[in-house]
């Protein structure tokens, strides 16, 4: 079974006041993703949270995601998704019972009985466990407890309640801050406070054949190859410009046989940072269609410096 693992789409994202929908970045990414989908033919698409950038998304963001889901449904590819901390779980899961009849499965809020979606391939059943963003108080409430004080114990308690058939292949979707034996994931500038949300050690997922994580924008494994953050498809901060962006492809064969690789997906605008004196910046050769962060290094800032740079770089957006 071939899976596309996505996360942190952040539809409706603004960067320095510019809409990534209006600037074309997110619609362009969807076009390129659909081309890759037609080329590689995944059996299912996983979205591990933060579909939207805000709990109350804009009309444009909702329309964009609606078009995206419609294209995937037309291709009859199952879509399995959870809510992240940026999403409103209730809003994201609106109409979930109707959507599941079209092969779109959404878990918006934590439940005592974790939603499980099962798909078949030539090797048998694959069970997908959908755990949207959780916090201890919510788990205490649904389990009728009051002793779960941190995120790690809350996740362990929730998973202990589930009947997981270990002889079958199991995949979990989670949107949390996951560490590997205390080692934290590599983050970017748009995630400066994410580490304070609460850590979960990756060994809590030991019973799962693949762990599809969201929450961190840099694509990376956490300890094992099969515990992975997909990362955001686009750079959402200039500090993310050198991060690994692409599409995480997972192939499940027989129990215990999992392979993972990254497919490149073109982006509309690259993020570039340049620095120097005004004279040096005006001589810099920069690729067309780029978002440029220009750092002027001189004691006196020239008058109308930003306007001058924008006139010099007419096909680029200067911040």
Q: Model-found features: residue ranges?
A:
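A conserved active-site cap/scaffold subdomain adjacent to cofactor or substrate pockets
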Residues: 202, 209-265
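N-terminal active-site segment of His-dependent metallophosphoesterases
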Residues: 1-70, 74, 172
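Short amphipathic alpha-helical segments and helix-helix/interface helices
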Residues: 66-70, 96, 159-160, 201-205, ...
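Accessory, non-catalytic peripheral segments of nucleic-acid enzymes
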Residues: 39, 44, 252-319
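His/Asp/Glu-rich metal-coordinating catalytic cores
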Residues: 57, 74, 83, 87-223
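Divalent metal-coordination and catalytic microenvironments
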Residues: 8, 50, 65, 84, ...
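Short, surface-exposed connector motifs at secondary-structure boundaries
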Residues: 73-81, 288-290
